């Protein structure tokens, strides 16, 4: 390993650690404002769990390739993803990592990776809805790399990340009007806000803010651009503070921050071995009986056979399990209640019980 590779992969580990800490610190806010696709108050918990899985994975994975490390972290996160937000983040992370494999993390490479993340995330959902985490993913992919700067430099990467986080923040603010359930509330989408927290953690890691440890970039060693993200960080924190104050005020009054659409039933997530054709069939059949269907490949097994992660909201958990069992043997199955009384109550399904 050369020194730069070691520094960069170490910085990836720092990014996930920081993201988990920041998500955990804001989990109560994310849970309180969670309204889409169902107001089950678990966005914060789901993101902490999913990103936490990625953070644990990178601590034991060994590779000098930043992209491969991110890709493998994404696969681990996707295999254990929770909720709509956790599943979409993991799908996005897999695509970003795959795009960066064999490349240094420059502004151009990062921009291309964000485009890959947009394509895969939007295609993973049967019915993508703007005004959510998807809008953040869409808008950051549209950010142009600064033209009047040296290609491949640390300064260009940092400035590009500044723009990416700024675009993410605008997308979060725009969710108030873009997502029907939020219109007129003055609140923002929880998944979108969670994605902003993760992206700002990446920006801070890349800039080495508050740390003398390695920064995440692939420029020349002599390129010592100073971090320029203090204002961006303040704006992100101000938005979090605003949501926290709103949640606290409602809690003091004994009222709900948002009254989201009532929904009963359960969330079913599972991993199953499928070909692309079988995955398409599973997606169609789950769409017929459920909502919020997400399907995305995790990793190739051999030939046309891949491991797929599947997410769906259904009224009858057995109906979803029957669809999966008709095409393969579901593994790592988790079922979580969506109704107000059952929300957050998760049960694991033993594969032997499905035979």
Where are these regions (language model features)?
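N-terminal loops that bind phosphate or other acidic moieties
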Residues: 1-355
């Amino acid at each position: 390993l050369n020194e730069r590779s070691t520094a960069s992969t170490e910085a990836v580990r720092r990014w996930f650690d920081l993201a988990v800490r920041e998500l955990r610190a804001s989990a109560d806010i994310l849970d309180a404002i969670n309204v889409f696709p169902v107001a089950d108050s678990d966005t914060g918990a789901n993101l902490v769990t999913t990103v936490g899985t990625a953070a644990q994975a990178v601590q034991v994975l060994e590779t000098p390739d930043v992209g491969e490390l991110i890709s493998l972290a994404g696969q681990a996160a996707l295999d254990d993803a929770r909720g709509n937000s956790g599943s979409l983040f993991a799908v996005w992370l897999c695509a970003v990592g795959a795009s960066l494999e064999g490349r240094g993390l420059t502004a151009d490479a990062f921009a291309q990776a964000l485009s890959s993340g947009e394509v895969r995330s939007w295609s993973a959902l049967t019915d993508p809805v703007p005004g959510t985490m998807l809008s953040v993913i869409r808008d950051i992919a549209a950010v142009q790399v600064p033209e009047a700067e040296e290609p491949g430099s640390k300064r260009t990467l940092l400035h590009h990340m500044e723009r990416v986080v700024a675009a993410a923040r605008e997308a979060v603010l725009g969710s108030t009007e873009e997502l029907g359930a939020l219109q007129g509330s003055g609140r923002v989408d929880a998944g979108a806000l969670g994605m902003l927290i993760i992206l700002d953690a990446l920006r801070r890691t890349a800039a080495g803010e508050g740390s003398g440890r390695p920064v995440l970039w692939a420029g020349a060693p002599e390129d010592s651009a100073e971090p320029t993200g203090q204002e961006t960080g303040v704006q992100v924190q101000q938005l979090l503070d605003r949501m926290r104050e709103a949640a606290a005020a409602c809690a003091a009054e004994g009222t709900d921050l948002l009254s989201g659409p009532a929904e009963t039933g359960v969330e079913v997530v599972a991993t199953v071995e499928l070909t692309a054709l079988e995955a398409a069939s599973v997606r169609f059949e789950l769409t017929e009986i459920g909502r919020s269907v997400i399907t995305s490949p995790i990793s190739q097994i051999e030939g046309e056979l891949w491991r797929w992660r599947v997410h769906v909201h259904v009224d009858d958990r057995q109906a979803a399990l029957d669809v999966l069992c008709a095409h393969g043997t579901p593994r790592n199955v988790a079922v979580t209640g969506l109704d107000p009384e059952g929300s957050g109550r998760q049960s694991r399904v033993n594969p032997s019980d499905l035979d």
